[in-house]
């Protein structure tokens, strides 16, 4: 996930992936995705999973951790996830090199009490956007 954020309307979440990510069209076609949060794994493992976004993801049994299934979609969720959200994709927009996905949260599950999550913060703008520096 290259960016994610909440929308002012309750239950809506915005996600962004590079258009070169092999899973983008699968997510759009299936209209389903699961997003998890954690503070139980190191950033090196997280980055290793997304290092080759233009290649086929590894088989579930080749992952370096255990998984469980999400309640509604039965999608694999990393066993170390403190929480996850199952989203129905209700729209998408191509924004240059990225695809913004608009998802409706249909299930949110807190699995483990978490102290903090791993976040990577980006600044997203395009030339001539008129955004002022913060």
Language-model region placement:
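Basic, polyanion-binding surface patches
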Residues: 1-134
């Amino acid at each position: 996930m290259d960016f994610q954020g909440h929308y002012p309307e309750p239950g809506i979440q915005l996600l962004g992936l590079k258009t070169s990510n092999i899973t983008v069209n699968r997510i759009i076609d299936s209209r389903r995705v699961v997003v998890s949060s954690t503070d139980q794994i190191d950033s090196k493992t997280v980055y290793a999973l997304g290092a080759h976004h233009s290649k086929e993801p590894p088989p579930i049994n080749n992952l370096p951790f255990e998984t469980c299934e999400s309640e509604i979609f039965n999608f694999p969720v990393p066993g170390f996830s403190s929480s996850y959200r199952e989203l129905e994709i209700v729209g998408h927009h191509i924004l240059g090199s990225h695809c913004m996905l608009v998802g409706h949260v249909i299930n949110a599950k807190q699995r483990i009490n978490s102290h903090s999550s791993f976040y990577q913060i980006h600044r997203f703008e395009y030339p001539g956007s008129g955004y002022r520096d913060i």
